[in-house]
Every structure is written in structure tokens, then in C-alpha cells.
């Protein structure tokens, strides 16, 4: 039996639960409890504050955890970062009052910086030869300059809207983060086998993101050119049609390239193009 720790609430909770659901692990309604079992996979889900997850996994109370890489780096716990998950993206940046002139990291020499991430900030300042003091606070870091608590802040930035509304501007991107799957370093053989199954499912879900399945009819005379246009997984699937001189072509493309590919295919005679959403791709 595995035990996986995820965030109690918020966007990362929702995305973690959605990932589990996408890979066939149903935890519907489970966040009303502190600990719950999945009905269809040998796993328990433990709901915690995000900053507690690395320590709980390192100590072995949970086998696995889904948490931001920023929390892993800040807590410094000895865990295995198994894989990036492709969601929960953010950055931790230095920001200063909008009216201030910024000339580079030397700006922070002798300044006081408010943050909830003193370890990551300390490492950055040391690497850049900057001596600054810190005001370590939890929550509402962005109000610190206006409240006279600090000269600048070091905090999570997603869209930047919160900074703007508090009269701040981002001047240094220090740490890029996203959700990661972490594991205790001393998993049993049984736990490791279950983790491998989870990873297989996660990879199948991940490779299907941003993909579309194309089906079309195309003149046989244009087939070689169409194959060059379409990357597919290995090569496109080609099937003859009852109508002489025509075939059916199936392929997978990135969503970002879809309309460009369709334009090229139409130009060489493709007809009846169907675009389907992919649920899973099994590697």
C-alpha cells in the first residue's frame, strides 16, 4: 500500500486530484477527510499543508508526495524527485517598489527583503555576493514594502497581477518551479513496484496532453508528401479506401501545430479531415 501526500486545498490540490483521476485513481470527495483510501488502487491519500509534504515524505510517514519544487528546495529534505508533472508552474522572484530604479542585483546590498523562502533567497544572495537582511513572514508578503516592513520582497509570482496591485515590479526571476512527484528514499520492493505502475500511468497521461488525432482521406498520389508533413508517433497509419486512388491517413499532431498541418494537407488534396481529442497515449 502506498500513501501519497497532496495539498489540502487550492489550485495544486485540484490539479493533483485531477491527475489521480486521469490515471484511474478515484478520490472523489476525499478532501473532506484527513486520510482516505482509493477504491480502485492500493493507495491512501493524505491531505497536508504544502510546506509539510517534503518532511512527511522524507520521514516515511508518506511514501510519495505531490508538491511544488519550490517547497522541496526550501525545506531541504532528503527526498527523491521522481518526475516533473507539468502543472502548478510558478516562479519565485525579487520585486521592488515600482518607482525605484533597478540597476542589478547590487540594488539589494544592505536592503531588507521580506520572504517566505529564506533558504532559497539566502543561496541566491550568497551566489551573487550580496549582503542583505531578511524579514521572514508567512502570507501577504507583497504588502511588506508599503507597510514599512521591508524594502523589497522575494515571493511566488504567477501572473504578476498581485505585484502590480501592490505597486511592485518584478526585477529578478530566481527560481522556476512546477509540481513534482517526490518519494521516500527507502521504499520497499512492493512500494517501488506500485510507484512504477503510477509512473507508467502518469507518462501515458502526460504524453497525450496537447495532442490531437487526425483522420483524413487523401489521394494516393499525395501520400508521400502527406507523410512528410505529419510526424505521428512512429509513422502515420495508411489504409486503402474502396474508391480507387484514395486512402485514409491517421496521425497524431501537437495542438499548437494543428492548423498549420491542416492547411498543408488541404493544399495537397486532403478531404474529410476529422480532428479528435486524445484521452491517453500508452507508450
Regions found by a protein language model. Give the residues of each.
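Small-molecule-sensing regulatory modules
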Residues: 1-42, 67-80, 84-91, 99-283
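Short, structured active-site "lid" loops
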Residues: 42-63
Amino acid at each position: 500500500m502506498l500513501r501519497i501526500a497532496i495539498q489540502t486545498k487550492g489550485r495544486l490540490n485540484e490539479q493533483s486530484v485531477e491527475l489521480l483521476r486521469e490515471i484511474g485513481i478515484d478520490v472523489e470527495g476525499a478532501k473532506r477527510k484527513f486520510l482516505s483510501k482509493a477504491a480502485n488502487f492500493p493507495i491512501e491519500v493524505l491531505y497536508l499543508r504544502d510546506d509539510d509534504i517534503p518532511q512527511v515524505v522524507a520521514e516515511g510517514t508518506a511514501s510519495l508526495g505531490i508538491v511544488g519544487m519550490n517547497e522541496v528546495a526550501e525545506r531541504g529534505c532528503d527526498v527523491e524527485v521522481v518526475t516533473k508533472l507539468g502543472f502548478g508552474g510558478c516562479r519565485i522572484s525579487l520585486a521592488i517598489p515600482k518607482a525605484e530604479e533597478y540597476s542589478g542585483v547590487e540594488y539589494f546590498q544592505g536592503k531588507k527583503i521580506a520572504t517566505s523562502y529564506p533558504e532559497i533567497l539566502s543561496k541566491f544572495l550568497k551566489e551573487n555576493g550580496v549582503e542583505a537582511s531578511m524579514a521572514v513572514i508567512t502570507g501577504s508578503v507583497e504588502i511588506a514594502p508599503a507597510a514599512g516592513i521591508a524594502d523589497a520582497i522575494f515571493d511566488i509570482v504567477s501572473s504578476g497581477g498581485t505585484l502590480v496591485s501592490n505597486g511592485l515590479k518584478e526585477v529578478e526571476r530566481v527560481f522556476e518551479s512546477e509540481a513534482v512527484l517526490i518519494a521516500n528514499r527507502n521504499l520497499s520492493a512492493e512500494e517501488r513496484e506500485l510507484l512504477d505502475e503510477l509512473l507508467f500511468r502518469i507518462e501515458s497521461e502526460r504524453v497525450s496532453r496537447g495532442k490531437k488525432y487526425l483522420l483524413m482521406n487523401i489521394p494516393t498520389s499525395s501520400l508521400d508528401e502527406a507523410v512528410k508533413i505529419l510526424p505521428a508517433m512512429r509513422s502515420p497509419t495508411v489504409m486503402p479506401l474502396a474508391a480507387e486512388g484514395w486512402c485514409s491517413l491517421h496521425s497524431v499532431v501537437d495542438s499548437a501545430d494543428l492548423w498549420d498541418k491542416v492547411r498543408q494537407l488541404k493544399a495537397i488534396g486532403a478531404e474529410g479531415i476529422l480532428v479528435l481529442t486524445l484521452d491517453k497515449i500508452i507508450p
